[in-house]
């Protein structure tokens, strides 16, 4: 009995999905991810000391995303590589991710980008905002993006000008979140909170996570523009 299965015929991963383990120890997480009875698995596990463990072969469909959605795709497990990053998570004492661990995440993701046509690098909370928080607001997404893995908002004046109008119109704002990839059926506040965890973590210091503001919309517009350019580059 295995806790993974073949990918659908002809399907190659185009997404990297990052998680935290949310368990008290690395050993407990590794045991759970390797246990067929758990019905949970990931392709890789990265310890806090930077050690990387291969759990599931990349050509197999691991079971890490659960009920999830991104950009019209509801079978995230089939199109993704799942990476579990050791951290106790919000339940057991959430803490920053050590530099050596982040370095291992970067190296692994860079390798995946060389082997596959990766168009999305996301967190579990992005694809399942209503039930997941990982890898969370302490994860250094900005640093990853600066080193070529994933996207990070780089706003221009036009973004801020448009944000002044859109931030006052929830209907228009919701359409933009859906355009980026979020599930239109997910509660709006959950989507905004997930966006903040990934792309505007500083807002958690103010206690205003989940609230729409002009800066949130400006960042959202920047990401939509970058994603459009990335998709165009991948086609060329």
Protein language model regions, located:
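Active-site-adjacent loop/helix surface patches within enzyme catalytic domains
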Residues: 1-119
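Basic/polar, cationic surfaces and motifs that engage anionic cell-wall
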Residues: 94-198, 202-236
């Amino acid at each position: 009995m295995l806790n993974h299965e073949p990918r659908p015929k002809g399907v190659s991963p185009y997404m990297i999905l990052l998680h935290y383990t949310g368990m008290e120890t690395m050993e407990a997480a590794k045991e759970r991810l390797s246990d067929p009875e758990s019905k949970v698995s990931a392709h890789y596990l990265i310890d806090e000391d930077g050690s990387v463990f291969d759990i599931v072969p990349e050509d197999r469909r691991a079971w890490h995303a659960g009920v999830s959605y991104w950009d019209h795709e509801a079978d995230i497990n089939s199109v993704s590589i799942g990476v579990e990053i050791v951290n106790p998570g919000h339940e057991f004492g959430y803490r920053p991710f050590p530099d050596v661990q982040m370095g291992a995440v970067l190296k692994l993701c860079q390798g995946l980008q060389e082997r596959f046509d990766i168009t999305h690098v996301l967190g579990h909370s992005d694809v399942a905002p209503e039930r997941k928080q990982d890898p969370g607001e302490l994860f250094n997404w900005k640093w990853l993006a600066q080193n070529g893995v994933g996207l990070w908002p780089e706003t221009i004046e036009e973004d801020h000008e448009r944000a002044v109008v859109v931030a006052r119109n929830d209907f228009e704002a919701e359409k933009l979140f859906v355009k980026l990839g979020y599930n239109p059926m997910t509660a709006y506040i959950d989507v905004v909170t997930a966006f903040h965890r990934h792309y505007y973590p500083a807002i958690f210091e103010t206690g205003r996570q989940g609230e729409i503001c002009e800066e949130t919309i400006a960042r959202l517009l920047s990401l939509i523009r970058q994603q459009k350019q990335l998709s165009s580059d991948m086609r060329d």
